[in-house]
């Protein structure tokens, strides 16, 4: 939210384009470096003179545009009844080790350290 407000204030002098930006909007997608090269999910980007660019000579750098962190951020917070929740990432071979998350406080949103899913205790 703060980033969107700062962005809105910086662009405010340019008129209607800045005012049409929704507050709280989050930009998803692939970032592009000043050289025009796509930035990967790990922030990997090389300078023009970097020797590691040799692997892309004669072919295009392929970047998956669906970053996992962006996909997880779109997931809503899960409301649960219990005070302690166990997250195993979906179970089976595709999951992760089972972790237990305490949801003691009313305002606390517990986040799984492996998969990033968020949980909140529903108080009745």
From Swiss-Prot:
Q: Which GO terms describe its cellular component?
A: mitochondrial inner membrane; respiratory chain complex I
Q: Which Gene3D superfamilies match?
A: q5lls5 like domains (2.60.260.40)
Its subcellular locations are:
Mitochondrion inner membrane
Q: Note the topology in the membrane.
A: Peripheral membrane protein
- Give the signal peptide range: none
Pfam families annotated for this entry? zf-CHCC (PF10276)
User: What family is this?
Assistant: Belongs to the complex I NDUFS6 subunit family.
- The entry's protein name is NADH dehydrogenase [ubiquinone] iron-sulfur protein 6, mitochondrial
User: Lineage in the entry?
Assistant: Eukaryota, Metazoa, Chordata, Craniata, Vertebrata
Query: What gene name is given for the protein in this entry?
Result: NDUFS6
